[in-house]
From Swiss-Prot:
HAMAP family: FtsB. The gene is ftsB. It is a single-pass type II membrane protein. Residues 31-73 form a coiled coil. Part of a complex composed of FtsB, FtsL and FtsQ. The chain crosses the membrane at residues 4-21. Belongs to the FtsB family. This is Cell division protein FtsB. It is found in: Cell inner membrane. NCBIfam families: PRK00888.1 (NF002058).
Amino acid sequence: MRWLTVGLLAAIGLLQYPLWVGKGGWLKVWEYDRQLQQQKEVTRKLEIRNAGLDAEVRDLKQGYDAIEERARFELGMVKQDETFVQIPEKVPGK
């Protein structure tokens, strides 16, 4: 009777091994789920960035406000009859 119990427990253990550790087992499923959640987060951040870039491209195509803003801040351009005044920032410790 004791050998039968040991044999059945061993059979159950051998049947459980592929379920938990084998190819396609629960441990792999949990790992794939974790990777999927990480990839979804990366994708969400990239979609937000792409939406911002798309809005900027549409604004550049349709209006001159974005072009003027870029010319002023990135290139330092000023309009005709406009005076440019630059105030230097104070450096801490001086």
